[in-house]
Amino acid sequence: MAFPVDLLDNCTHEELENSSEDYLSSLRCGDPEHPECFSSLNITIPVSLSNVGFVPLYGGNQTQKILALFAPEDSLTAVALYLVGQWWAIDDIVKTSEPSREGLKQVSTLGERVVLYVLNRIIYRKQEMERNEIPFLCHSSTDYAKILWKKGEAVGFYSVKPTGSLCASFLTQNYQLPVLDTMFIRKKYRGKDLGLHMLEDFVDSFTEDALGLRYPLSSLMYTASKQYFEKYPGDHELLWEVEGVGHWHQRVPVTRALQREAIKATDVSQYEATRPVSGEYGLAAVPEHEPGLDDTQSSELQIHSLKDAFASTSEGPEKTPVSTRTRSSHLKRPKIGKHFQDSEFSSSQGEDENVAKTSPTASVNKIEYAARTSESSEEFLEEEPEQGVIDFEDESGDKDAQPALETQPRLQKQDGDKDSALEPVNGEVMDAALKPSLTTEDEDSTSEGLEEDLKVPPFNSSGEPGNPVPLVAESSKVPEATLAKTSPDTDSEMLIDQSPSDDKGHTEENLSPVSKKKTLLGSSDNVATVSNIEKSDGNFPNSVVPEFPEEPVSQNLSPNTTSSVEDQGEEGAPEAQEPSATQSSLIEVELEDAPFPQNAGQKSQSEEQSEASSEHLEQFTQSAEKAVDSSSEEIEVEVPVVDRRNLRRKAKGHKGPGKKKAKLT
């Protein structure tokens, strides 16, 4: 029986394609209810237009095609080819009836090209290719190839890219040496040294000094090369593993490639030996890792470190290494209007001063405690109004002297003098302070009045007088010295008190420290005296003055703003002695708006402001007398002694231009 390879010896591509076109035309005209069937290996496949088509014989070249029949379940695998006027099964196409076709025969006829196509494209790629192998491309019509025939059947092939042939990967480059491109042997014929036979035929077919094998080496090429070098050890420099077209930088000796593959095979065998068998997990290859206990310990340490890393990310913000400055509550600015319960104000005074330096509005909240204290003691307003005014007068004098005492070395000498009472001395001072005829004094008498007023001994908590010092002769000078310090405050506070009358009740409750000052200015004569003294005392250097510019206070300021004015005084003397809770708020009032050295224009301006503000004093005098007695019995003051000589010397050294002495009638 003749097979297609035998029948196609004298056939051309055109004749084969024309016969295929004629059959396809007859198939279109056939009866669809009674189709032709093809039987192979006990399988019957109906032939119809839906499962037949042309396939290229040389891969990318679409000019030479053959008609193929596909299985219904696999439309990409041909089960038969239409050759010589009939359908031929794949197994029949690779057979021959010619006894002369034995061994390796070079492909030359159309039938042999069809056999090469079937071996490469159908048998190898669809049936026998391994997973780790790379499929071969379809051979062209001019490729050098040989088919291995064995007992009337094609069992394998190999193909070569001769020197000078065009490289498919590099379209403009040609091969520099003959390269063994493909090699294939069917599985049922492997193990009979057929690969070695093909390699020996390749070496004998080309006479070049260097021959190449396609990179990467297939398993068949690797086995054949190994057998070849065992049989011919002198040809180590003949065979090269070639990549690309085979330049010198693209070739490696096959012996080195064999060593590389041997190392890979050893690693794979060790892995296979150590890999647990199915059903016996955890029992394989444990003793091999026991000698190196350090490896297991290091792996455990890595696991623990990973656990710690994951735990640190889930424990919370307290262990997070990021800065929490913006989250800390003590660094946030308190909002205006928020009330702090400063029951222990003296213990937290240092912290409040630091916050007040960076945020002046934060001091508003600290004075509200004193305001609420004055509200709680409203019941004492009608009982001792005059005595409350006297208390505030001595307190203001005390507070004027206190910042100056920070630079005096005699501060420790006053610890034992705390036995005098406040009431009898203040009564005498009040009698003199309320006299309507106050005369202006020169700058020397003003400083003398201040110094002699500071000699009042401190009072103890029991309220009993120790060694009272009579101040009757100097009663007219005490309010002058006191008002000289507080005249800038008084001017600004007169503007505060010009708020609408509906807020008057609220002002009387919350601004008791301010009202205490207003009672000292009983008439316009007092204001004139204050303005003159203010000019002389404007350059007084011994008082600790915070660097805040004087600004006019608006008439609509709230009581909280007045409290902030009082609070800023505390910032000017952060190193002063720590007062009690009720005294600290009053100290802040005296130090806040102490003026800078004034020129002539500024002094005249302040004098005009004091004269304008005196018009509003009388209408608030009665309300102030009711509010001045807030916490009069609760306030305990210390009046430390200031060095008189230093105060007088500094006061005289900073005198302004001379003023005419005038009596105000």
UniProtKB/Swiss-Prot annotation:
PANTHER family: PTHR22442, SOLUBLE LAMIN-ASSOCIATED PROTEIN OF 75 KDA. The keyword Phosphoprotein applies. It is found in: Nucleus envelope; Nucleus inner membrane. This is Soluble lamin-associated protein of 75 kDa. The lineage of its organism: Eukaryota, Metazoa, Chordata, Craniata, Vertebrata. The keyword Cytoplasm does not apply. Residues 376-397, 440-451 have a biased composition (Acidic residues). The modification Phosphoserine is found at S348, S377, S447, S512, S610, S613, S630. Residues 311-326, 521-533, 553-566 have a biased composition (Polar residues). InterPro entries: FAM169 (IPR029625). Residues 412-421 have a biased composition (Basic and acidic residues). GO terms for cellular component: nuclear inner membrane. It comes from Mus musculus. Residues 309-665 are annotated as: Disordered. Residues 327-338, 646-665 have a biased composition (Basic residues).
